[in-house]
């Protein structure tokens, strides 16, 4: 049950931060928090990570729905038996649903976290959650592999 609460907190944080960006910033506006290093930049992405597959709204909605169903089924099966994998999936679930809401409502994802120093693509809380979840999942696979040797 905790895993769904974690996902819900991620979804709420993601949607709240995106709401603030849409409400208080103009599209394209950039506010330096650390000059030339990290900015809040109001951006919209109609594709996937790094802007690939632009204007494929229904494709992403369908894929995300399948992924979310798969994650929920996996959480039901794994639950407390594999807590690290379940934690990872809860992060991915929260991030996937956060971006799904954007795509379903407006056809685009609100991005705003901009590391200008390294010219990294602009991203959001949902993207961070997905990345953290995948990282935890990779760590889990690595640690389980070492344990089973």
Curated annotation (Swiss-Prot):
Catalytic activity annotation: Release of signal peptides from bacterial membrane prolipoproteins. Hydrolyzes -Xaa-Yaa-Zaa-|-(S,diacylglyceryl)Cys-, in which Xaa is hydrophobic (preferably Leu), and Yaa (Ala or Ser) and Zaa (Gly or Ala) have small, neutral side chains
Subcellular location: Cell membrane
GO CC entries: plasma membrane
Active site, renumbered: 111, 127
Membrane topology: Multi-pass membrane protein
UniProt GO BP: proteolysis
Pathway(s) this gene product operates in, as recorded in its UniProt entry: Protein modification; lipoprotein biosynthesis (signal peptide cleavage)
EC assignment: 3.4.23.36
Protein origin, superkingdom: Bacteria
InterPro entries for this protein: Peptidase_A8
Pfam families hit by this protein: Peptidase_A8
Keywords in alphabetical order: Aspartyl protease, Cell membrane, Hydrolase, Membrane, Protease, Transmembrane, Transmembrane helix
Annotated TM spans: 58-78, 85-105, 122-142
Single GO MF annotation: aspartic-type endopeptidase activity
Function: This protein specifically catalyzes the removal of signal peptides from prolipoproteins.
Entry similarity comment: Belongs to the peptidase A8 family.
Record-linked PANTHER family: LIPOPROTEIN SIGNAL PEPTIDASE
Designated name of the protein: Lipoprotein signal peptidase
Species: Brevibacillus brevis (strain 47 / JCM 6285 / NBRC 100599)
Name of the coding gene: lspA
């Amino acid at each position: 049950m905790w895993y769904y609460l974690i996902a819900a907190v991620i979804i709420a944080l993601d949607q709240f931060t995106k709401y603030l960006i849409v409400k208080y910033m103009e599209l394209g506006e950039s506010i330096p928090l650390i000059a030339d290093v990290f900015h809040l930049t109001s951006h919209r992405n109609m594709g996937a990570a790094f802007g690939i597959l632009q204007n494929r709204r229904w494709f992403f909605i369908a894929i995300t729905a399948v992924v979310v169903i798969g994650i929920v089924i996996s959480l039901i099966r794994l639950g407390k038996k594999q807590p690290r994998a379940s934690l990872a999936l809860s992060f991915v679930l929260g991030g996937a649903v956060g971006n799904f809401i954007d795509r379903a409502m407006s056809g685009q994802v609100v991005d705003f976290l901009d590391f200008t120093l390294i010219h990294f693509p602009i991203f959001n809380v949902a993207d961070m959650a997905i990345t953290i979840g995948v990282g935890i999942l990779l760590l889990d696979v690595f640690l389980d592999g070492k344990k089973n040797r």
